[in-house]
Amino acid sequence: GKHSFKAVTKRYFELSKQPFTADIPEVKNGHISPYDPLFKKHAKNIGWDWQLLASISYQESHFNPTVVSWAGAEGLMGIMPNTAKALGVTPHELKDPDTGIRTGVDCLRRFRQGFSEITDPEEKVKFTLAAYNAGIGHIYDAQRLARKYGKDPNKWDNNVAEYIRLKNDPEYY
């Protein structure tokens, strides 16, 4: 890919609620995780670098397919049970690595479709990842705020990203 795993992972962490740490798995012999073949297989369904899917999985689960987060997200891709149900998958099925990754990609594709007005491919990835992380409703709210305050609702950096942070401030609502 055109970006190294560390660079891609750092960018995903920057979009995440959690602070970026240097605690990134070491890439050994070109392998990031035992699930690399599954990331490669399912990345084709969204047209993304498989390392970006691996980055999401590392952030969501540290590559543990049976983990349940503090918020209740399950599996390698950190899918919420209601999201899984909406995609026809039970929370138990998310523990299967292939199903978990496929469901994560289905979820990402749905979020991406929600940003059809964003034409720049890199911007669309940023918005899609942000929606995956924070929920699409929060991103739509931040876009409305960006528009209201004269920023570009279709640009992430220094535009919509600022309003994600300010959304909790009633002065901006």
Model-derived regions: residue spans:
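Extended ligand-binding regions for polar small-molecule ligands
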Residues: G1-L15
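Catalytic glycan-binding domains that act on GlcNAc-containing polysaccharides
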Residues: Y12, Q18-Y173
